[in-house]
Amino acid sequence: MGKKVLAVVKLALPAGKATPAPPVGPALGQYGVNLVMFTKEYNAKTADQIGLIIPAQITIYEDKSYSFILKTPPASVLLKRAAQIEKGSNNGTIVASITQEQLQQIALTKLPDLNTKDVKKAMSIISGTAANMGIQIL
């Protein structure tokens, strides 16, 4: 029989730069997880994606061991990076634009975490996020 799961914690952390300070410390410390070991593992697995926010789903077991799964970065982070902007628009005003090729690349990156396997549908989902952020698709 497998290990008994104590909790599942979801965190969005900067790639390669996680520290035992908040939000990691309070979220995992209450379950007795070795914070230094977790941050070292997380930083090692995300070292090639520095500058992005990488969500992690951490499963904590009763013996205080853990496992974690890395997800793809949020679409908004990928869109801001492609459009080379710091912040999207909050009122629908066009603040930047990206090409269809950039949109397709973002959709391919996000495909494992989306509820579709079709690239065209994934592009549609991402373009909706882009429109809400004030990013125009050329």
From Swiss-Prot:
Subcellular localization: Plastid, Chloroplast
InterPro entries with a match to the protein in the record: Ribosomal_uL11, Ribosomal_uL11_bac-typ, Ribosomal_uL11_C, Ribosomal_uL11_C_sf, Ribosomal_uL11_N, Ribosomal_uL11_N_sf
Pfam short name (any one): Ribosomal_L11_N
Spans traversing the lipid bilayer: none
Any one cellular-component term (Gene Ontology): cytosolic large ribosomal subunit
Signal peptide as annotated in the record: none
GO molecular function, one term: large ribosomal subunit rRNA binding
Keyword terms of this UniProt record: Chloroplast, Plastid, Ribonucleoprotein, Ribosomal protein, RNA-binding, rRNA-binding
Main location: plastid
A biological process term (GO) from this entry: translation
Tree of life domain: Eukaryota
Similarity section: Belongs to the universal ribosomal protein uL11 family.
Function: Forms part of the ribosomal stalk which helps the ribosome interact with GTP-bound translation factors.
Subunit relationships: Part of the ribosomal stalk of the 50S ribosomal subunit. Interacts with L10 and the large rRNA to form the base of the stalk. L10 forms an elongated spine to which L12 dimers bind in a sequential fashion forming a multimeric L10(L12)X complex.
Entries under PANTHER family matching the protein: 60S RIBOSOMAL PROTEIN L12, LARGE RIBOSOMAL SUBUNIT PROTEIN UL11M
NCBIfam families membership: L11_bact
Name of the protein in its database record: Large ribosomal subunit protein uL11c
